[in-house]
Amino acid sequence: MPRSVNHVASRAKRKRILKLTRGYYGARKNVWTVAKNTWEKGLTYAFRDRRNKKRNFRALWIQRINAAARMEGLSYSRLMGALHAAGIEINRKVLADLAVNHPEAFKAIVAKVK
């Protein structure tokens, strides 16, 4: 009995991966083994960077709040401590947005905790 091989499924799998690697440079887009490895590595990077994105944004918010707070004569840590002591529960994302887009609202918050 001859060996049965499912070429249809194999070809479909290869085609699917090669479709996902469209736009990559060189052999990464059209050589099956290289494309497969590149695609898998891309998934690894995506997984890692979904977590790093959260850190990076938090760091960005802190930098923006710190810059705006220093213009008002406070450091970031003193501002956050004062906000906590005053019972003002506003997260860093919103505070950074206020500092950048609505500086008068940010100044009002700082004036409240000074």
Curated annotation (Swiss-Prot):
<protein>
    <recommendedName>
        <fullName>Large ribosomal subunit protein bL20</fullName>
    </recommendedName>
</protein>
<comment type="function">
    <text>Binds directly to 23S ribosomal RNA and is necessary for the in vitro assembly process of the 50S ribosomal subunit. It is not involved in the protein synthesizing functions of that subunit.</text>
</comment>
<comment type="similarity">
    <text>Belongs to the bacterial ribosomal protein bL20 family.</text>
</comment>
<keyword id="KW-0689">Ribosomal protein</keyword>
<dbReference type="GO" id="GO:0003735">
    <property type="term" value="F:structural constituent of ribosome"/>
</dbReference>
<dbReference type="GO" id="GO:1990904">
    <property type="term" value="C:ribonucleoprotein complex"/>
</dbReference>
<dbReference type="InterPro" id="IPR005813">
    <property type="entry name" value="Ribosomal_bL20"/>
</dbReference>
<dbReference type="GO" id="GO:0005840">
    <property type="term" value="C:ribosome"/>
</dbReference>
<dbReference type="Pfam" id="PF00453">
    <property type="entry name" value="Ribosomal_L20"/>
</dbReference>
<dbReference type="InterPro" id="IPR049946">
    <property type="entry name" value="RIBOSOMAL_L20_CS"/>
</dbReference>
<dbReference type="InterPro" id="IPR035566">
    <property type="entry name" value="Ribosomal_protein_bL20_C"/>
</dbReference>
<keyword id="KW-0687">Ribonucleoprotein</keyword>
<keyword id="KW-0694">RNA-binding</keyword>
<dbReference type="GO" id="GO:0006412">
    <property type="term" value="P:translation"/>
</dbReference>
<dbReference type="GO" id="GO:0019843">
    <property type="term" value="F:rRNA binding"/>
</dbReference>
<dbReference type="GO" id="GO:0000027">
    <property type="term" value="P:ribosomal large subunit assembly"/>
</dbReference>
<keyword id="KW-0699">rRNA-binding</keyword>
